[in-house]
Amino acid sequence: MAGESTNSVGNDITSLIQPGLDQVIQDEGVQVTLINSILGWCRIHIINPVKSSKIVKSRAFQITMIVLGIILLIAGLALTFVLQGQLGNNAFLFLIPAVIGLVKLLATSVFMEKPCTPEKWRLCKRLLATTEDILDDGQINQSNTIFTMDSSESTNAAAS
C-alpha cells in the first residue's frame, strides 16, 4: 500500500511539472546551460584524468586528433552525397565516419575547454537534424522526428 501512494505522489508531481518543463526545455539558453553542465561533469570525471596522461599532453597527439576528425567528417559527408545515387538507402552508412569525425571534433573542443555557445548549439542541432534526416530513410526530405529543422530555425529566429 505504501508503494502505491508513493507512485501516485510521483505521478502527481510529474503532471504538475510537465507543462512548465516542456516550455522551459525549448528555451535555447536552458539548453546551452544544460549542455555546459554536462560538459563540466564530463570534464571533471572523465577528461581531466585522461588529459593528465603524457601521450595526450603531446602536441603531436592533439594535432593528429584534430586532423583525423576533420578528415573523417569531410570524407564521410563527401561519400554520402557522391555515392547516394548508386547505393540508394545504404548511402547513409558513409555517415558513420562523418559522425565519428564530428564527435572527435566536439571532444577535441571539450579538451580545449571551450564552453558551448548558442551559435555552436544551433550548428550542432542543424547537423544532427540533417544526419537524422539521412539516416531514417536515406534521403534529405525533412522526415526527421527528433531533431527537426523547425526547432533549430525557431531558435535562430528567436536569437535574431
UniProtKB/Swiss-Prot annotation:
It is found in: Membrane. One of its GO terms (cellular component) is outer membrane. Keywords: Membrane, Transmembrane, Transmembrane helix. The chain crosses the membrane at residues 63-83, 92-112. Signal peptide: none annotated. It is a multi-pass membrane protein. Pfam families: CRPA. InterPro entries: CRPA. This is Sulfur-rich protein. It comes from Chlamydia abortus (strain DSM 27085 / S26/3) (Chlamydophila abortus).
